[in-house]
Every structure is written in structure tokens, then in C-alpha cells.
From Swiss-Prot:
Residues in TNase-like domain copies: 59-217
Source organism: Scheffersomyces stipitis (strain ATCC 58785 / CBS 6054 / NBRC 10063 / NRRL Y-11545)
Regions crossing the membrane: 20-37
Protein name: Probable endonuclease LCL3
Localization (cell): Mitochondrion; Membrane
Residues reported in the UniProt entry to bind Ca(2+): 113
Gene3D superfamilies: 2.40.50.90
A GO MF term: metal ion binding
Length: 235
């Protein structure tokens, strides 16, 4: 029996431009879907979900402030994709503390140190309550964007926090320093400023000249770092 002649015009090689184009399209779609899922679908629940890549890329995270615990830190419920992914209308943010357990990141504001509150029977610094009240009113129960830099020894995510106000997006650390309710972070290790260190120092100098907040204390003013060294030595 004679062999059936092959029609070379119907053969398609794996290296055919159409095959290569289709393969490239499938690969690109899969990659973009993966990146979209990572950035806009996957929730980061605790510091254990923060990868080195997220820190290296300073990947912006959008979420809701569930609680302000101190003058320079707060609890953050990650809501990837925001309202476009249903947060706030289709997907509810828990309000019960038990429901929020292991579901939030502790954010430590970068570049700023607020006056120390009373802990373990130790005295509170002047303006510590004012700083807490200010931060609570500024970001509490609001959506913010955080830019992560590192994780500190207390498992907090050190980050820049930004919140929308009527006058635009505000850097929370900068606004706290502007009000004299925090000073530029003075620790020699673990300091994170992003690209705003010069701005923070200029705002601090202005608040000091205007005697705002802690700077109204004059020579009685003690920095949070000095206060901790004096009252928490050996703890």
C-alpha cells in the first residue's frame, strides 16, 4: 500500500511563529495573573507573611487601622485591592477583637518617636496622651497606605504610613513631627526614614522654633530615647 502523502502546508512546528506567540501569551497571562493575585487578592495577616521581596520592593500595602495602641504604632488590617476587591461593602472588616486575632499587622511609624506612655508602673512622658489622641483621630478607623521597610525586634512592621485628607495624601510621621507630638527617631540602629529624613528633620527644627508640643517644655524636655534609658534601665 502506497504511503499517504503528507501535506506539508498543514504541519505546524513548535517553533512556528504562531505557536511561539500563543505560548508567550499564555505565559504572560499566567505571570500577570499570579502577580495580580499576590498584590490584590492575597491578604497579609501577620508579620510572618511579610517576605524579603516585599521589603526589598517596598511594596505598598492598603488597609484599615483597627486600633491605635500607642503614640507611634497601630494595628493594620490588610485589604488588598481595597474597595475594588469588595472591601467595605462585599467583604466586611472584623470589629471583634477575637476575630482580629492573628489577622492584623502591627505598624511602627518610621522616622518618628512619640513620648512614652506609662507602662508597668513607670511614669508617662508629657504629651504622651496627646500624641495617642492625635494619632487615633488622624488614622484610627481609616484606610491608610503603608510602605514597609523592615521588621523590628518586637515583630512590628516599620513603615511609612500615608492617609488621604482633604488637602491630599499625608505622611503620618511628618505630620506628627510637625505638630511637635513626636521627634525624629534618634536610635542608632534600626532607624528607617525611607527618603524623607531631611523632611522630618526640617519639620522638627520648625516645630522646635515654634515651641509646639514637646518643644514647649524647653529645657525640661526629655527625648523618648533619654526617657527610656533613665526609667527602663535594666528592664
Amino acid at each position: 500500500m502506497a504511503p499517504i502523502p503528507q501535506n506539508s502546508s498543514t504541519e505546524v512546528s513548535l517553533l512556528h511563529p504562531k505557536v511561539l506567540l500563543l505560548s508567550a501569551g499564555i505565559t504572560t497571562t499566567a505571570f500577570l495573573s499570579y502577580k495580580f493575585h499576590q498584590r490584590y487578592v492575597t491578604r497579609l495577616r501577620t508579620y510572618l507573611d511579610i517576605t524579603p521581596k516585599i521589603l526589598d520592593n517596598q511594596q505598598k500595602l492598603y488597609g484599615y487601622v483597627t486600633r491605635v495602641g500607642d503614640g507611634d504604632n497601630f494595628r493594620f488590617f490588610h485589604t488588598p485591592g481595597g474597595v475594588f476587591m469588595g472591601w467595605g461593602w462585599l467583604r466586611k472588616i472584623p470589629t471583634n477583637r477575637n476575630q482580629l486575632k492573628d489577622e492584623t499587622l502591627m505598624i511602627r511609624l518610621c522616622g518618628v518617636d512619640a513620648p512614652e506612655r506609662s507602662h508597668w508602673g513607670k511614669p508617662a512622658q508629657p504629651f504622651s496622651e496627646e500624641a495617642l489622641i492625635w494619632l487615633s483621630s488622624y488614622v484610627g478607623k481609616r484606610y491608610v497606605t503603608v510602605t514597609p521597610f523592615s521588621i523590628d525586634q518586637y515583630k512590628r512592621l516599620v513603615a511609612r504610613a500615608q492617609v488621604w485628607k482633604w488637602t491630599g495624601k499625608k505622611d503620618v510621621s511628618a505630620e506628627m513631627i510637625r505638630q511637635g507630638l513626636g521627634i525624629v527617631y534618634e536610635g542608632k540602629s534600626g532607624a528607617e526614614f525611607g527618603d524623607n529624613e531631611a523632611l522630618y528633620r526640617n519639620l522638627e527644627a520648625k516645630a522646635k522654633r515654634q515651641k509646639k508640643g514637646v518643644w514647649s517644655l524647653g529645657k525640661k524636655m526629655t527625648t523618648p530615647g533619654e526617657f527610656k534609658r533613665e526609667h527602663y534601665r535594666g528592664d
